[in-house]
């Protein structure tokens, strides 16, 4: 059973590495995923040991109006709504803490976290995004090494951003909602820490 989970983890990792080097595959993934998405979306991949994102999908132009080459961790921090900056870090901290303390190492990559945030579009207006993140590579010690993030524009739903973060497991069909109201220091593997002080 653990061996099959490692195979699945490696397949996930290899798919995203392949997409990173084959833009036409990225287009196919976008075409398949789009009908099932709640709105227009883009995705990006981050290695916890690197300062920059390793991949950003072309569809960011349709969602936020920016070129993918301009979308860096520092730029993401710059276009976050001022009221959401602390919440973003708090929500990520709570999620990472939950995964490290409550979930076995083999199950970490089966969870995704989801919450709402606002980002400034190139036209100057803020849009509401559903932020989803899923670890795609985890060390034997349980450190998250690589994560895929998906941002979906849900502005048309007229929802308000709150302190809630949801953790959803694909294996046991469970969902946990947490109120992320504590303001704590971010752990070193949280990419928000790397650019929140810039």
Where are these regions (language model features)?
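Histidine/lysine/aspartate-rich catalytic loop segments that bind and position anionic ligands
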Residues: 154-176
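Short, low-complexity N-terminal regulatory "tails/caps" that precede and couple sensory modules
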Residues: 1-19
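Helix-turn-helix DNA-binding segment
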Residues: 178-198
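Sensory beta-strand/linker motifs that couple input domains to effectors
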Residues: 150
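Per-ARNT-Sim (PAS) sensory domains and their PAS-associated C-terminal
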Residues: 99, 103-133
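PAS-family sensory domain signal
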Residues: 20-75, 169-185
């Amino acid at each position: 059973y653990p061996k099959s989970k490692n195979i699945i983890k490696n397949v996930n990792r290899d798919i995203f590495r392949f997409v990173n080097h084959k833009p036409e595959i990225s287009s196919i993934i976008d075409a398949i995923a789009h009908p099932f998405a709640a709105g227009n979306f883009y995705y990006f991949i981050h290695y916890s040991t690197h300062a920059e994102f390793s991949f950003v999908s072309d569809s960011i132009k349709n969602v936020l109006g920016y070129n993918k080459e301009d979308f860096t961790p520092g730029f993401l921090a710059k276009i976050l709504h001022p009221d959401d900056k602390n919440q973003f870090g708090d929500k990520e901290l709570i999620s990472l803490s939950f995964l490290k303390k409550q979930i076995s190492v083999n199950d970490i990559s089966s969870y995704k976290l989801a919450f709402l945030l606002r980002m400034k579009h190139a036209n100057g207006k803020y849009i509401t995004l559903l932020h989803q993140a899923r670890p795609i590579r985890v060390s034997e010690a349980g450190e998250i090494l690589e994560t895929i993030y998906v941002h979906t524009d849900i502005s048309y739903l007229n929802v308000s951003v709150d302190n809630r973060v949801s953790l959803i497991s694909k294996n046991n069909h469970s969902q946990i909602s947490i109120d992320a109201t504590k303001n704590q220091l971010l752990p070193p593997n949280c990419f928000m820490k790397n650019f929140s002080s810039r």
